[in-house]
Amino acid sequence: MSFDVGGTLIQPWPSVGHIYAEVAARHGWNNLPPETLNQNFAAAWRAKESFQHTQEDWADLVDQTFAGFCAPPPSQTFFPAIYERFAEATAWRIYDDALPAIEALASKGVLLAVISNWDERLRPLLQQFRLERYFETILVSCEVGFTKPSPVIFQLASRQMGIAPGQILHVGDSLAEDVAGAKAAHFQAVLINRDAGSEAGEWINSLRDLESLISRS
């Protein structure tokens, strides 16, 4: 079984906007509204194209998020502090259902992997959370040169795991990147949607459902 990370295993905490406002305040930009920053970030994230998770990509996204609040833009001032802040486990929280699900699957001998669109900060984060020990294979887009939904990153995971694609179930929170990408590589796929309700037809609202899901397969 393979997992996405952001939005699947961990989430920014308390939110992207809160972390951005926290860092901005340390650099003289006080009382910026986290809710507005969250909205700006979400809009910029939806509009992004060809995002490769480079520092330049992130700097541009941060500038868009702070548009109208800061001059000069963060890319010329405190962006490095934001980038480093998200390398710290205290900027993230493990979903309540993630660790119990991973431990249950590992105890049953299920081979686990990570397939994530991320940058060089991911492995240290997984280590800080002590999650890396559960995964036989960890594939990070910045290291392999391919991002989901490219089937190549899934195929690389299959080879490293030594398991045929059709025998691997991928779990993630993005229909386009995780479900469509996995299926293009002939993986099985399931969407994690903790808010319940999905147009996909193949979804779970808790990672705890995975144990019973594989028991039925």
PLM regions: where:
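Asp-based, Mg2+/Mn2+-dependent phosphohydrolase catalytic module
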Residues: M1, E35, Q76-P80, L99-A106, ...
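N-terminal helical cap/lid subdomain that shapes the substrate entry/recognition surface
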Residues: M1-P100
